[in-house]
Amino acid sequence: KLEEKIGSDDFNIRCRQLRKFSWKRKAERWKESEAFHDLRAYRRLKKDPELRRYYELKKDPVFYQYRSWSLTFEDHFNTFERSKWITRYYAGERFLQATYGVGRDVQLFIPDNVRVREGHLYLEFRQQQINGKYWDPRWGIITKDYGYTSGMVNTALSFRQKLGRFEVKLEIPADSSLDYCFWLTGDRFYPHINIVKFGSKGYEAGCFLGNPGEEQDVEQLKRKVRLKSGFYIFTFDWLEDRMIWKINDCVVKTLKIHLPDAPALYACLSLGTTEEPGE
């Protein structure tokens, strides 16, 4: 009876219907899967002209050098990560547990003037009367009245590097009485490398290897560099035999002599001035 049943036309028709139904259900389930939606997105993106251009450029020999590089530090400023940054001079963090001013600083750097919002780091310069510490070369730490406050961040406790590439994207005004700075330094004041210092004098780049004014002072004001207000990518390549400064990947300065025999340095971002700021 079983053989008669499975050999009947009705049974075979029913089996074909079930197989067809099962295949249809599998196809419907596939279209509902995450893998199916990923495949559709992939096929759509393959047609995107910018992505197609990216894959074409990826094969260009010009970019081969970057494939051997390793990323050592980055921050996109989605949040302010205190494990990466401190908001005062390193000596203040290490010895005083407080902020302080040095040299001709007219401002005191305080953490309230540092904030992060929507992927941007903001350093704010404010007219504000405040009493704070100051390093006097004759008397050491004293107190002083400041008329301004500002913001700075550095990686002294989290990241230091010798050789390699250092890069930052900064928004600068066309003209300013304040100095927008990205610089490298260590536990001593020298060497001090300005990757960018932009202010009332214009764009400056270079490094101090000794006291300002001495022969080793190779800081340079690039008067021919004219920058309109906007965002720029400032790059510093520190190599064994040279140092290279770039703006938007265009070389603006190369140094092959008086190269510092420096240890690993940490990165700093600051906004300030050594003169009474204009309006």
Regions found by a protein language model. Give the residues of each.
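GH16 jelly-roll
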Residues: K5-G7, F11-E279
